[in-house]
Amino acid sequence: ILAGGRGERAKPITLQSADYIRSKALIPFAGRPLIEWIVEACRDQGIRRFYVVAQGVENRSQIKLVLGHGERYGVEIDYSRARFDPYNVGSGAATLHNLEQWNLTGTALVLPVDSLFEFSLDKLLAAQRDSDAVVTVAAVSRTPEEIAGKYGVMRTTAERLVCGFLEKPRLPVIEREFPEITQPQGPRTLATNAGMYLIDCARLRLAARTPELIRLAQQRLDWGNDLLPRLVGLGHRVAVEPIARLGDLGNIRDYLGTIGDALGGLYPQMDRALGAPASTEPRYWIHESSLRSKDHITGTTLAQKIAEGSVVIGPGVRIGRHVEIGAGVRLRGTDVGDGVDLHEGAQVEGSVLGDSAVIGAYAHISDSYVGPMVQVRSDARTPVRLEALSAVGDGAQLWSGTRLSGVSVYPRLRVPAVSGVPTGTQLTSSDDILQWV
């Protein structure tokens, strides 16, 4: 598991304070750190030995605190040695250096820690065996419009062997290089790299012992941009095998989209891990302790309020432990962490509410992230509104009347009743906030 990234694109989700970043592996996802889902999804397909490539003191200690050595999960987990951190320059270099460190010679699955995968290990193994490939690339099919300027494309033969790459091509280039996609009866999707690789460790280690790859592994060597093209250029067999789905978690938009897809049933492996929903029509999960919780105003339980219709839970909702929900609350497509307070009249859609967040009365939150311990001090007269990929970091406070659209608020900040802050603004300090007061 390649877990050394700093999570810069996902700020403020990855921030515990303005100057302390948590590992991407610990991004909260449906009630658990992301890396737990990854380990369990692999374990359930028969993988019992894990190697975590970490980077730096905080990254390594944070992950180890969650996973330990795998005892809780019935697996074995080892960690990269700290003295090799300076040599982990890029995902490809990190892989090659640690294959040598652990002296791995069998078959291994390499995957990043900031994505959610729906895949079949058996199909990847079969593709590797049938093609006699050094590397089998897990591929996701995407339309030209999805690919343009964002994803690299792989050229493949009829035998699903990679024969070339196009790095983030624009739409005209895609149409020129793949004319079949413009034909009425032609394919409408192309294979893109999902960032997951099944490798023959011994053969890959041998292939990497060329002067060029040895030099690059000391400078910068990424899987997609560097290692794969050079392996293909040197004549090594690199195969492609489609997987069902990939969800990126590296930025706010993709994070919210992926968790929405997961709660919407598009990741069957995660569905099984979540367990049976509390309701199948609409489909949602509510922990038993939350169904029994009484709000402090009406004194009625959540189960009673759902039954009488004063609280409406739509599809794609997960509610964690000991959540208190007031009358008039509406939820749809939202993940609600443990210990959250949702006061009367609050409406939340397409969002994530972190553990112990307090959402004030009549707040309107859509397509946004609200971190743990955030206080949204909304009221009926001056409600708070968050929308359009806004993100509020751990422990921040939003005062009544605040309206943010596509704005990020860093942890621990206190935001007064502001509006009109331009979309894309990052409020990282009190000085940033003062510009808009």
Where do the model's predicted regions map?
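Conserved core of the sugar-phosphate nucleotidyltransferase
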Residues: 64-67, 117-211
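A short acidic, often aromatic-flanked loop/helix-cap motif at beta-alpha or helix-coil junctions
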Residues: 83-90, 144, 171-173, 246-248
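Residues at the starts of beta-strands that form the adenosine-phosphate
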Residues: 48-50, 134-135, 237
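Left-handed beta-helix
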Residues: 115, 202, 206, 211-437
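Conserved N-terminal catalytic core of the sugar/cofactor nucleotidyltransferase
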Residues: 1-2, 7-20, 27-123, 156, ...
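Conserved beta-strand termini and adjacent loop/short-helix elements that scaffold enzyme active sites
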Residues: 80-82, 138, 241-243
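Alpha-helix termination/capping residues and helix-transition junctions
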Residues: 44, 101-105, 118, 130, ...
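Conserved beta-strand segments of alpha/beta enzyme cores
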Residues: 25, 76-78, 161, 237-239
